[in-house]
Each structure stands twice: as structure tokens, then as C-alpha cells.
């Protein structure tokens, strides 16, 4: 699959499903001109803004994420890096693992997140996927009773 908009749509729907299963209420902004793709509200009413990314698994077992936005218009192709105040988290969907990773929007965002062991079995300074499966703790399970039916 190569169409960028289709990948973005798949990523967004997978993140919405993941957030719902984790007890968040996902909300989509009315305007596509916001620097974030959706808002996640936890069981306490706290809202987090998320920028969704679709990132495929590389052969070496990592997901690389580009923390910038790209667009094209009649003046050419443009690239702009996100700023810290635009949203709270990146929600990165990896289709090969059918997994969503949540990375805090900060200056020290990992550029690569690893799913498989390194070739040299190094573990120091490796950013493992399992450390990015939760979004800011665990909210109350808003839909837990509904899901058990």
C-alpha cells in the first residue's frame, strides 16, 4: 500500500480502536488544520492531544518515525518540524505488528523504537516497544463493562 492518505486513515482508525480498548474516549477535531489528529479523554476528564503516525517495521526490527509534517502545493514540497506545544503525544501505528506506540512529544523523542533483539544483543540505550504501549498511565475503564457483554 503506497497511498499516504490511506495509510493515515488506517493509522487513525487503529489508534482510535486502541484508545477505546484502553478506556479512553477518542475525539476527532472538526478542522483538519489542527496540529493534532485526535484528542484522548481519560476517565478523569483529562484530555491529551495526539498526532498520529503510520510507520512500517524495518528489516532490522525497528520502527523509525519522522517527527515532522510534509505537504505539497503549487510552490513545491514543504517540511516543517513539530513544536512541543502543538500536541502531547505521538501515536505511532505499526501495521506489521498491529500495535500502537505512544511517544511523548518532547525534545528527546526516540527516533527509532525496537521490536526485535539487536544483532549484537545490546540492550543499553535501546528504546523497546513495550515501554511505549501506554498513554500517560491507565485511565478508568470507561467501557470495560460494555466490552465484557
Predicted regions mapped to residue ranges:
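Mixed-charge (Asp/Glu-Lys/Arg
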Residues: 1-34, 39-149
